[in-house]
Amino acid sequence: MIVWGGVTNGLVSPYVNTGGRYSPFRNAWTAHLTNAPLVGRADHTAVWTGSEMIVWGGVSSTLPAYPAYHNSGARFSPATDSWLSLPAYLSPTARAYHTAIWTGTEMVVWGGYNGSALNTGGRFNPSSGWSGVPVNNAPTARYNHTAVWDGSKMIVWGGTSDGTNGITRGARFLPRTGDWTATAWLGPVILPDRINYCAVWTGTEMLIWGGKKYSYGGNTSYRNDTFGYAPQRITYLYTRP
């Protein structure tokens, strides 16, 4: 497991650009990743390519009222213990609270926030650089959502566009054609909106668990339910206890 970036409890420069590597086999940490060519940040994304970790985006600030959003990134190779900066040319707009997935050949970044919610993104291929993600038929702008890769499509769901109201819709993106398709469901189960939850792809379905429903006006309710989304079963949503 490779960990990088985040926020500490320190009052001076709380955003860090260091990390570490954890070996479950040896139950030990090694290599503190202190030579990253990136400023400290949080709420960025990281994907694993099979040989490298790619870090992109995020936010940092010396004052909460003046956040600095980033559109920079870098690739870390554990084999050589070295970093390589991502090209800036054609990279997406700076953002944080976005999602990123690895398709097997490229990283797809989508959504996020940089003062307002976004419904744009980008695709990074280590061999050829950045290219865009179409906005035609793209889902509603959002952040604090989730995205998974099902082997051929990126599935996006949930999040919020204003920090108050959750979104209960999503979409599937097919990189091969550049097409977006809205998700839908059948049956009596309606998936409650939420943010700050987790989602994984099992090989056959997207599982969504936890999160919270937040309102600036008052109440915050936390979720402990699980929902599954299976595209191959005519997009049927169900719940598990």
Q: What kind of region is each of these model predictions?
A:
Residues 1-241:
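Kelch-like beta-propeller repeat domains
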